[in-house]
Amino acid sequence: MKQICILGSTGSIGTQALDVIEQHSDRYEVYCLTANNRYEMLAEQARKFRPAAVVIANKAHYEALKLLLADLPDIKVYAGAKALDEIVEAQPIDMVLTAMVGFAGLSPTIHAIKARKTICLANKETLVVAGDLICRLAAEYHVNILPVDSEHSAIFQSIVGEGDNEIEKILLTASGGPFRKFTLDEMRDVKAADALRHPTWDMGAKITIDSASMMNKGFEVIEAKWLFGVEADKIQVLVHPQSIVHSAVQFRDGGVKAQLGVPDMRLPIQYAFSFPERLPLNGDRLDLFRQPLEFFEPDMEKFRCLAMAYEAIRRGGNVPCIMNAANEVVNEAFRHDRCGFLQMADIIEATMQRATFIAQPTYDDYIASDAEARRIAASML
């Protein structure tokens, strides 16, 4: 019985992970659930899955959560960022699913790696911000990082059994988001409500906006570089509106392996949990007769965030960290009508130019760079 800790259990990935665990309750048990603000939902989940502990990151909700679980004394209730770092180190835990959003996922992921827990990585910002550090720590502590993003899971599934066969190119697919066919003038006027209507995936608000701007795909290019040791110029983004081909790998003989399936995040979540085994999963099955599969080149002028991600990789150091911090600020501002859709890229680009460059950042440098970039980006709103 694998004991699983879910960082971010009330979000889109977290709730779908609990569905997987419920389907395979003979194999998986929830050791800990965590949330940032949604304490009522966290309490409901705790009642259903009976974990050993729950953590609410926002300390303001601690008393309310404790009250909701007062009749279940076996469930320990903790609060705060430090509690997140400590809970992932708990001895019974086998796997940690990092489904938190943003920079906040970095510290508990590092603590989980140092405690030699298998990492099911859904928090892509961890590798965007500190890919070099995370990969070095994973190697040092002999920890497996299993990708949960559908694209990276597809790449991972495509290279299983390939041993040392060299990857010639990664074909990273993108839906193109809701504004794929918009002109720049049309994109100038879009609002958060428009961007939150993703054509193929059901995701949280932050990642849905990132998908609309294609910053999410930029993050995934960086994530793929670190996960698979492939340089950015060998990672090609393909706009694939149907989201059926989740990604593909081209090898040096010209052969291409791809992973296909209906857009259902439970599949990559379950694959990370069960690897190398495949377990049954209820849900729709792929019908290739239903629709044609299309592929287009992304428009880097319209979707500047994707171009900036390649630039951040090229510059290296703390630049991806700076880009991520600025993006978190403008993404939230856009969702609250304090920033225009195209203005997000302007502010991110300006922050990348103005923030202090550090060629070989330490963990403390990442913390400082994140704070500095947030201040710079916020000053332009």
Kindly give the residue locations of the regions a language model identified.
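Catalytic, metal-anchored helix/loop core of enzyme active sites in primary metabolism
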Residues: 1-381
